UniProtKB/Swiss-Prot annotation:
Subcellular location: Cytoplasm
Entry-annotated residues carrying N6-(pyridoxal phosphate)lysine: K269
UniProt GO cellular component terms: cytoplasm
UniProt-listed Enzyme Commission number(s): 2.6.1.11
Family in the record: Belongs to the class-III pyridoxal-phosphate-dependent aminotransferase family. ArgD subfamily.
Highest taxon of the lineage: Bacteria
Residues annotated for pyridoxal 5'-phosphate binding in this entry: G116, A117, F149, D240, E241, V242, Q243, T297
Residues involved in N(2)-acetyl-L-ornithine binding: R152, S296
Keywords: Amino-acid biosynthesis, Aminotransferase, Arginine biosynthesis, Cytoplasm, Pyridoxal phosphate, Transferase
Name used for this protein in its record: Acetylornithine aminotransferase
More info: May also have succinyldiaminopimelate aminotransferase activity, thus carrying out the corresponding step in lysine biosynthesis.
Length: 418
């Protein structure tokens, strides 16, 4: 048995081995050929000592950057006290985080879980319970947008309006229908058709800005009317704020960008600053869960909640919301300048705050993943949001000088494709 284990171990890669060496990790990601070992602020280092400017931040997750002093201190203290207990008992760190969230949002109560997909699963269950209890619907329908992304679990991916994510996993969970994002006429026609014979729609689940779907910002006029229609029909309006929430868009919450309030919204990513936590936040009238309706073993554990509360208070203490607005404007201005200087390659810029997308020309012969790959040569980390959008989601602490470096390295990357 020992020889067999040694044989297995020798077949797999290790730190310092070739980045393309086989590993025991399942191949669910098409990984870049880079092994990252440490980080500080907006910078990360690989196993060869190369330094990269990180405009990915764990995909909009490391709000305070890497190895943040306040996070290290608070989490070190928490590990000395209590790391995990069951939700069968009261958890002070969980209650403190919930209090902060409801004091600083439109919500009245919070359910904690471990990820964005889990938060959206909870939202889907909440929507169905609302449909059954409040609207008397036997088979509730949830409306979501084309090009949306709500997670990789089965119900969340069924809610995702991108058929390529469905392939190979059929049958999808029933009860989802899709409409064109920001298209009010199409939405109203679909809603009227579905409601013509009586109540059938329980909720609308929608991103204020579509991240994975191409960095598509919501239009305020569309969302205002969406809010009116949902209220008129007693339909829950649920925002997926997994990527835009916790200050990334230049406000605490994406709904503030649009001037309306949802009945519920979901969070994850930046909430934990790099630690696994998700949340469903609801207004009082949408708080329908009862004991036994939903649960999470690890959701809201003391360690994760301590991390999230530290992130929230550090964003406040450092005035990062205003800085995100300033740095976002600086980044957008620089990206707009690149569009003007690379007209054959680039089409435009879109996004909010420090969630910006550089849109490639439709006829360009290269893709956003090609750009992300080439950026590694310039020691820059960026990611794709679909085939034609290069996405930048740096830590919220990024400095003006680092924005300038990001733009310089991105320009050098684009020169590969002239």
């Amino acid at each position: 048995m020992v020889d067999a284990l040694d044989s297995k171990s020798s077949a797999f890669g290790h730190v310092g081995s070739s980045p393309t060496a086989p590993t025991a990790v399942m191949g669910t990601y098409k990984r870049f050929p880079v092994t990252l070992l440490r980080g500080k602020g907006c910078w990360v280092w690989d196993d060869h000592g190369h330094q990269y400017l990180d405009a990915v931040a764990g995909i909009a997750t490391c709000a305070l950057g890497h190895s943040d002093r306040a996070l290290r201190r608070s989490l070190g203290q928490q590990l000395k006290q209590l790391q995990h207990v069951s939700n069968l008992y009261r958890i002070p760190e969980q209650e403190a985080l919930a209090h902060w969230l409801v004091e600083n949002s439109c919500a009245d109560s919070v359910f904690f879980c471990n990820s964005g997909a889990e938060a959206n699963e909870a939202a889907i269950k909440l929507a169905r319970k609302h449909g059954h209890r409040r609207r008397g619907i036997d088979r509730p329908i949830i409306l979501t947008a084309n090009s949306s992304f709500h997670g990789r679990t089965l119900a969340a991916i069924s809610a995702t309006g991108q058929p390529n994510f469905h392939k190979g996993f059929e049958p999808m969970v029933e009860g989802f229908e899709f409409f064109p994002f920001n298209n009010l006429q199409a939405f109203e026609q679909q809603l009227n058709r579905l409601e013509a014979q009586g109540p059938s729609v329980a909720a609308v689940l929608i991103e204020p800005l579509q991240g994975e779907g191409g960095v598509n910002p919501g239009e305020a006029g569309f969302f205002r009317r969406l809010r009116e229609l949902c209220s008129q029909h007693q339909i829950l309006l649920i925002f997926d704020e997994v990527q835009v929430g916790m200050g990334r868009c230049g406000n605490w919450w994406g709904y503030q960008q649009l001037g309306i309030e949802p009945d519920a919204f979901t969070l994850a990513k930046g909430l934990g600053g790099g630690h696994a936590i998700g949340a469903l936040l609801v207004k009082q009238h949408a708080d329908l869960f009862e004991p036994g309706d939903h649960a999470s073993t690890f959701g809201g554990n003391p360690f994760a909640c301590k991390a999230a509360l530290t992130v929230a208070k550090e964003i406040e203490r450092r005035g990062l919301i205003a800085k995100v607005q300033q740095r976002g404007a600086q980044l957008r201005e620089g990206l707009t300048d690149l569009v003007q200087r690379f007209p054959r390659q680039l089409k435009g810029v879109r996004g909010w705050g420090l969630l910006q997308g550089l849109v490639l020309q439709d006829e360009s012969t290269f893709t956003a993943p090609n750009v992300a790959q080439a950026a590694l040569e310039e020691k820059l980390l960026v990611i794709a949001a679909g085939p034609k959008v290069v996405r930048m989601v740096p830590p919220l602490i990024i400095k003006p000088s680092e924005i300038r470096q990001l733009l310089q390295r991105l320009e050098a990357t684009l020169a590969h494709f002239r």
